Amino acid sequence: MKLLRMTPGKGDVLLAEGDPSNAEDEERLIEEFRRQLDLGMWAAVPLEGEAGRREATMVRDFSEIPKAAERVIFFPRAAGGRR
C-alpha cells in the first residue's frame, strides 16, 4: 500500500509505502495516516466502480481502508467557506 499526498504543481508525493499485513509496516502506515489527518488533510481510497468507472471512498480511520487497496491519497480541504 502507498500513502500519497496530492501537491499542486508537483503531482503525488509518496509519504509511506508498506505491506499492511506486516505488523511493522502497518504501524508505520497508521502513524503516517494519522499524521496527515492531524495536519488537516482528507483521505480517499481510489476504487474501480461499476463498468470500470473511477470512484473514491473517503476514509477517516485506517481500519476503514479496504484490505485490497493499493493506495490512499491525501489532499487538502477546500479553502474558504463560512467563518
Can you say where each PLM-predicted feature lies in the sequence?
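Extended boundary segments
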Residues: 1-40
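Short, flexible beta-strand-to-coil junctions
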Residues: 7-8, 46-50, 77
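Generic, low-specificity signal for short hydrophobic/alpha-helical stretches with a mild N-terminal bias
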Residues: 15-18, 50-54
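Short secondary-structure boundary micro-motifs
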Residues: 26-29, 46-49, 56
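Hydrophobic alpha-helical segments that drive targeting, anchoring, or assembly
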Residues: 32-33, 42, 73-78
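Short, basic/aromatic beta-hairpin or loop at an interaction surface
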Residues: 36-53
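Short, compact, well-ordered microdomains
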Residues: 51-83
